[in-house]
Amino acid sequence: MADFEKIKSIIVEQLGVDESEVTPEAHFINDLGADSLDTVELVMALEEEFGVEISDEDAEKIQTVGDVIKFIDKLKG
């Protein structure tokens, strides 16, 4: 599994939410209050941290913290 703590840290930093709110089930828009700019910045931070490229099409499919974990795992193989 992708490093959940690292992903959580990025989300907390990018969205300014409390660590306790960042669970695999948390939805970025509905639960964590992210807007479209927040999600773009989050994707960019994830790309930089994990050395991966996330296409716009794939980024649109990432809606929860769990989606990020699965996606990073898949990319890192």
Curated annotation (Swiss-Prot):
**Matches recorded under HAMAP family:** Acyl_carrier
Mind telling me which residue stretches traverse the membrane in this protein?
none
Domain of life, per UniProt, equals Bacteria
Name assigned to this protein: Acyl carrier protein
Q: Which GO terms describe its molecular function?
A: acyl binding; acyl carrier activity
**InterPro entries noted in UniProt:** ACP, ACP-like_sf, PP-bd_ACP, Ppantetheine_attach_site
Note the SS bond partners. Answer: none
- Recount the PTM note: 4'-phosphopantetheine is transferred from CoA to a specific serine of apo-ACP by AcpS. This modification is essential for activity because fatty acids are bound in thioester linkage to the sulfhydryl of the prosthetic group.
Biological process (GO) annotations? lipid A biosynthetic process
Keyword match Nucleotide-binding:
no
Record family assignment: Belongs to the acyl carrier protein (ACP) family.
Carrier domain sequence ranges: 1-76
Concerning Pfam families, the annotation shows: PP-binding
Where does this protein reside within or beyond the cell? Answer: Cytoplasm
Keywords noted in UniProt: Cytoplasm, Fatty acid biosynthesis, Fatty acid metabolism, Lipid biosynthesis, Lipid metabolism, Phosphopantetheine, Phosphoprotein
* GO CC terms of this entry: cytosol; membrane
Q: Which pathway features in its UniProt record?
A: Lipid metabolism; fatty acid biosynthesis
Name the principal localization, coarsely classed.
Answer: cytoplasm
Q: Does the keyword Lipid metabolism apply?
A: yes
Residues that the record marks as modified (O-(pantetheine 4'-phosphoryl)serine) are S36
Q: What does this protein do?
A: Carrier of the growing fatty acid chain in fatty acid biosynthesis.
